[in-house]
């Protein structure tokens, strides 16, 4: 949620930025009308409350003098009814303003390139050289099936399209990748390993910006009797970031750095026909997520650090990748600046997204009321929140299988993973 003061004091400027940079049309006439109503109702309720307080004192004085206060009490009742009605109208207007505010995307940072879609993203760097093969390259589907480790037919039987079953050495490598990532982030990058619920309530989803706008992207549960509805997490960013919801943090404790390995669940609404085969786009996939809660003056510096932590995973696995700064038209709803890391996938002869690292500025913090305060200060400030994949485990598995394949269909195990796989150096045939 962007700063409401910007909407009140710089509405035309904000609307123009949203139109140009986000292709978002803000209904300024409606918002202006609602804001006028809010101001009028605010004045009305304050005046009625002040008048009611004054009359209450007058009734007390009249009673002390032994006067008949019945007419005064009747007036008080009437004024109370007016106040109740005015407050109800004010609450309704505030709720409508809030709903509009919740639908507005974050404003991009000034350095974010203007563009309509991913074709206008800006490449920052490339690391590593894609391998040259002297044999016909197989995709991860073929490699996994030949190793008796990937079973998409079983996934379809158990659940449907966009599910897979992993077995044996492939399943072991998948687990090894997640453990390797967690150990790297906790032992070398300073993150606190965190275990969180995979089901969350709607307040949590509002906090990080999935609701109300992106409900169709989630898997929702039916509310059980006496319980609230839940949704399966689309990313560990949701529960981990919300750990600071409604919390005032001592600034001396910042930054707070947390990581979690969780399954993620996405409906992939709007992705019909895209990546229908393989592990690239699944309804259920594992991811190691990094979250930072930082001093609001240091979030851009933190974004570079966090992105570097994701890059380190790829570098240690010796997987070629490129780093891309997303343009305004390709950014996520709540982000003010995002880097994507794209790993080389030989069978597709292209780079594919494997990590997205974002500075959310104070967008999520305002929704969550996550604040910080320096010792001795009375005033609080909204923290800044950042998140990034470190990495998507399934897509990393895809990259390892394809980049480390051999002519006989076997896969060389990257050196960094061998301690997690009982010393195995080759899997498959």
Swiss-Prot record:
Stored CDD domains: SerRS_core
GO biological process: selenocysteine biosynthetic process; seryl-tRNA aminoacylation
Cellular compartment(s): Cytoplasm
Residues binding L-serine: 235-237, 289, 389
InterPro entries: aa-tRNA-synt_IIb, aa-tRNA-synth_II, aa-tRNA-synth_II/BPL/LPL, Ser-tRNA-ligase_type_1, Ser-tRNA-synth_1_N, SerRS_1_N_sf, SerRS_core, tRNA-bd_arm
Major enzyme class: ligase
Annotated positions binding ATP: 266-268, 353-356
Protein name: Serine--tRNA ligase
UniProt source species: Haemophilus influenzae (strain ATCC 51907 / DSM 11121 / KW20 / Rd)
Record lineage: Bacteria, Pseudomonadati, Pseudomonadota, Gammaproteobacteria, Pasteurellales
């Amino acid at each position: 949620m962007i700063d409401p003061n910007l909407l009140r004091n710089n509405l035309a400027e904000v609307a123009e930025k949203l139109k140009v940079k986000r292709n978002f049309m803000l209904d300024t006439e409606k918002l202006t009308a609602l804001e006028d109503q809010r101001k009028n109702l605010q004045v009305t309720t304050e005046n009625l409350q002040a008048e009611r307080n004054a009359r209450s004192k007058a009734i007390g004085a009249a009673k002390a003098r032994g006067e008949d206060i019945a007419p005064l009490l009747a007036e008080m009742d009437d004024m109370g009814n007016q106040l109740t009605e005015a407050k109800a109208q004010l609450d309704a207007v505030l709720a409508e303003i809030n709903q509009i505010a919740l639908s507005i995307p974050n404003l991009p940072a000034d350095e974010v390139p203007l563009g309509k879609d991913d074709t206008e993203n800006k490449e920052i760097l490339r690391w590593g050289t894609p391998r040259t093969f002297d044999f016909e390259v197989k995709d991860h589907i073929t490699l996994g099936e030949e190793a008796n480790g990937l079973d998409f037919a079983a996934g379809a039987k158990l659940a449907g399209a966009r599910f897979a079953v992993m077995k044996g050495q492939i399943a072991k490598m998948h687990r090894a990748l997640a453990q390797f990532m967690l150990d790297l982030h906790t032992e070398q990058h300073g993150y606190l390993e965190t275990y969180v619920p995979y089901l969350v309530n709607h307040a949590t989803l509002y906090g990080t910006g999935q609701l109300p706008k992106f409900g169709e992207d989630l898997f929702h549960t039916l509310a059980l009797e006496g319980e609230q509805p839940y949704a399966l997490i689309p990313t560990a960013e949701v529960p981990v970031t919300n750990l600071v919801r409604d919390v005032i943090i001592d600034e001396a404790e910042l930054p707070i750095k947390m990581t979690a390995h969780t399954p993620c669940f996405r409906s992939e609404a709007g992705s019909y026909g895209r990546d229908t085969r393989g592990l690239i786009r699944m309804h259920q996939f594992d991811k190691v997520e990094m979250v930072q809660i930082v001093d609001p003056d240091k979030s851009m510096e933190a974004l570079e650090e966090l992105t570097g932590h994701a890059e380190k995973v790829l570098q240690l696995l010796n997987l070629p990748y490129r780093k891309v700064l997303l343009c305004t038209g390709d950014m996520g709803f709540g982000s003010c600046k995002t880097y994507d890391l794209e790993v080389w996938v030989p069978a597709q002869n292209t780079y594919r997204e494997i990590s997205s690292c974002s500075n959310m500025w104070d967008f999520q913090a305002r929704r969550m009321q996550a604040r910080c305060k320096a010792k001795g200060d009375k005033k609080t400030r909204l923290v800044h929140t950042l998140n990034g994949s470190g990495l998507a485990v399934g897509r990393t598995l895809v990259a390892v299988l394809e980049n480390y394949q051999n002519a006989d269909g076997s896969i060389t195990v990257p050196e960094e993973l061998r301690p997690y796989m009982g010393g195995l150096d080759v899997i498959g045939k």
